[in-house]
């Protein structure tokens, strides 16, 4: 990009639970959002158990991809990147999905490794945060995996573990509310993964824990007492650890219908918020963080910034 010129980019993040699009104009250190959207497609449905995509999950995701491509064409986008993460890494039939996306977009989707996923999440989450809050520990709780990224202006260490909210729901929390046995088994699994991440990433050196993605922002909405979801109220809100634990316990005690009735709850997150909030609660306990900074900027924004730098 020539200095002083703006470039219009389209970033697509394809996770285990959601497909998201960001179209933005970027000039220097300024990002102007043109369009942002999320669809719950649950591409990773059953992948933890079957190690393969369900045909209906591929179909849902490709339909949404086509709708996104129609928008991208209408917005005169100059650069586009499609990044697929945890579920696509794990699926034995991922080539069926990759070929389908290529046929729609005319470019190959990138199945990025956990380390790159972590770096992009870090870039997106920390871009607009004051350096006086560094070093940062960015925690990205996705549908299939959770990334832990430590850094200041650059990533110093990162590790990805398979404790996403969809994976934990399918593996452990199969009823709502979950049983004590299900919760205990989930905690055992989650804690082991966090401790593994801690052997690669020194949690104690971080000054600020930034939590990104839908689990963290939904927990923030609950902690803030929002009547409906408000991304502007959530972004950069400080949520004390005790409130995280209380929110996780609240979700674990509710029925599916009670969760669905919450005004800030996205319909596609109803069956995974209990597991997701449990992961975040265990992260707070095992890292020793006293609060987290909620961020609406994440891997999607990181993909966009990366495109502008090409």
Regions found by a protein language model. Name each.
Residues 10-12, 81, 137-139:
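Short aromatic-hydrophobic micro-motifs that form the base-stacking/packing surface
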């Amino acid at each position: 990009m020539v200095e002083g010129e703006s470039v219009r980019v389209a970033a697509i993040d394809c996770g285990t639970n959601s497909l998201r699009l960001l179209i933005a104009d970027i000039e220097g250190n300024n990002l102007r959002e043109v369009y942002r959207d999320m669809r719950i497609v649950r591409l990773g449905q059953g992948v933890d158990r079957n190690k393969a995509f369900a045909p209906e999950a591929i179909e849902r995701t490709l339909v949404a991809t086509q709708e996104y491509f129609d928008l991208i064409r209408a917005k005169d986008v100059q650069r586009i990147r499609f990044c697929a993460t945890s579920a696509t890494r794990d699926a034995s039939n991922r080539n069926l999905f990759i070929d389908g996306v290529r046929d729609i977009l005319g470019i190959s989707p990138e199945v990025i490794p956990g380390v790159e996923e972590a770096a992009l999440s870090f870039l997106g989450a920390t871009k607009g945060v004051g350096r006086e809050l560094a070093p940062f520990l960015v925690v990205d709780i996705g549908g299939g995996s959770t990334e832990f990224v430590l850094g200041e202006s650059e990533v110093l260490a990162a590790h990805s573990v398979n404790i996403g909210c969809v994976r934990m729901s399918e593996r452990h929390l199969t009823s709502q509310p979950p049983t004590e046995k299900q919760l205990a088994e989930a905690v055992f699994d989650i804690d082991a993964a966090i401790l593994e991440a801690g052997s690669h990433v020194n949690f104690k050196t971080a000054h600020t824990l930034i939590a990104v993605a839908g689990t963290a922002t939904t927990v923030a909405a609950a902690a803030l007492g929002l009547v409906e979801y408000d991304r502007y109220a959530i972004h950069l809100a400080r949520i004390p650890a005790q409130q995280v634990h209380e929110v996780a316990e609240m979700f674990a005690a509710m029925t599916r219908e009670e969760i669905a009735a919450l005004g800030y709850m996205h319909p596609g997150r109803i069956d995974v918020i209990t597991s997701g909030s449990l992961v975040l609660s265990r992260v707070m306990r095992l890292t020793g963080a006293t609060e987290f900074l909620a961020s609406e900027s994440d891997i999607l924004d990181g993909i966009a910034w990366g495109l502008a730098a090409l």
